[in-house]
Amino acid sequence: MLANVSFSLVPRPCTTVLPHPEGRYKDTATNVFATREFAVNLVGRSMADAMNVTNIDAPPGINEASLAHLTTEPSASIKPPRIKESPVVFECRLLTSLSFNSNQAVIFGEVATAIVSDEHVLDAARGIVDAPSLDLFGAMHAARWYCTTSERFEMVRPTWAQWKAEGKV
């Protein structure tokens, strides 16, 4: 179930490139331009097949979420719905966009609300999420290549004082 835990972030932009092979914007872009709001639904590996169905080249007006047997539900802070099965949703308001031709745009949005499924929250008060448990993946290039976030590493950021003390600057 998508979260009872909801917390605000310092506004950060989300970007999406939205091409359509038939020389027009995809419905997603058209809807963003019309409503000036959108939900970015992050996808775990268990949702890969459903996510792939939502990328079908359906004609305008077809609800791809329904085709994929996904459930929509009201968003917390925007009018467009979110995907109930998504472990993380960023509810966004349009800041600006760049159009490159008649079917491709980069959309920049301000995150109004971030919603995370309870099972993936380590510390709600501090906004700490169990990222490995999300098992996220994303599109890379072409129409069929994806990457996972299963290989992770942590690095401690150096401080200026530390570098000065070590004679590096």
Task: Locate each region found by the language model.
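Basic, polyanion-binding surface patches
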Residues: M1-V169
